[in-house]
Amino acid sequence: MTHRSFRFSIERPVEYRFTDTRGGPRLQGRTVNISSTGVLFRTDEKIGVGRKLEVTVRMAQLAPNAPEIDLRLLGMAVRSGDGWVAVQARKYQILRPEGIAA
């Protein structure tokens, strides 16, 4: 029996870049859902399965007067279709917007 991670339907802005090429642009998208094993997001780009990505999700404030945080993950595209990609996370990191680890 396989374990499936619970998915949270969260729509947030995404910025991503390919880590298997040098000097590529940072691209934009929007999350569809997030789980403990990865993220599914919409994008205008065609992303092939196997591509390595760094994905930064702009999270909302967790509490009044709290700083906003970003969720950054390193992973690989495991499924993709017309206008979407599923990225399996290899590593997660929570950052303050300035890029400093929380």
Indicate residue ranges for each PLM-predicted region.
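Structured alpha-helical
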Residues: 1-102
